[in-house]
């Protein structure tokens, strides 16, 4: 899986990100990309093709990628999140009474930028996407968990990089460049892991589907992707797998939706239009509905 949009219209990877200038620590930039490694290199002038004009400001290069939000089901969803993060004073995804940034030009501190990120993750439109926040810097992690505006919620999935960087060892050019190289390496490892995890899951699912007829664990309907592939007029049934590597659960996607929706109704008293998560009927681990749907779309393409 590369960084292109799949035939089902689902990106293999897409994230929004927060950059911070290494020499000017109070300068930030918010953007989005299907390939954070390539984009970070563009921002730092290592790649001339691809723009990144706004990060060419005098004295701000090189930049480090401080935080990312990934798991978007489409490029459009990522661009909506990016725009809302950039314009917190007017976005419809934050209620007027909840706004931390109330006017254009405000919200420049790291506390405010991360607080806006949390507010966006609270909105139902983004909440059902089960987005993942990844933090690459020790001081960014401290700000996140300090939670100055008291906006933390247990449903926000946060990944803390084990090798997160501390502050640059000095202000000289050599120290700044070394810090930038280490940050780029962290982003490379993160991006590679993300693609590999999805690729390995999809490879295993395709292998199982190539065996032919499979029975839904819920309605017992027979699904045969091999047979459907031979028929130009037949649309493939959307299917669901458990992504626990030791679980062999398989069902129609619609059947699992009914299970997740019913379980969420029991927990909350409300029938969800889109469930956020649910337990695998076979192994009982918590599964992200958005992730299951994303895999299902790739498999049916």
Swiss-Prot record:
Q: What is its main location?
A: nucleus
Q: What is its EC number?
A: 3.1.-.-
Which cofactors, if any, are listed as required? a divalent metal cation
Any one GO CC term of the record:
Slx1-Slx4 complex
Question: Which Gene3D superfamilies does this UniProt record tie to the protein?
Answer: GIY-YIG endonuclease, Zinc/RING finger domain, C3HC4 (zinc finger)
Q: Tell me the keywords, alphabetical order.
A: DNA damage, DNA recombination, DNA repair, Endonuclease, Hydrolase, Metal-binding, Nuclease, Nucleus, Zinc, Zinc-finger
Cellular compartment(s): Nucleus
Annotated GIY-YIG domain ranges read 12-95
One GO MF term? 5'-flap endonuclease activity
- Role according to the record: Catalytic subunit of the SLX1-SLX4 structure-specific endonuclease that resolves DNA secondary structures generated during DNA repair and recombination. Has endonuclease activity towards branched DNA substrates, introducing single-strand cuts in duplex DNA close to junctions with ss-DNA.
Q: How does it assemble?
A: Forms a heterodimer with SLX4.
Family matches, as PANTHER family: STRUCTURE-SPECIFIC ENDONUCLEASE SUBUNIT SLX1 (PTHR20208:SF10)
Q: Which HAMAP family match?
A: Endonuc_su_Slx1
Q: What is this protein called?
A: Structure-specific endonuclease subunit SLX1
What organism does the record attribute this protein to? Eremothecium gossypii (strain ATCC 10895 / CBS 109.51 / FGSC 9923 / NRRL Y-1056) (Yeast)
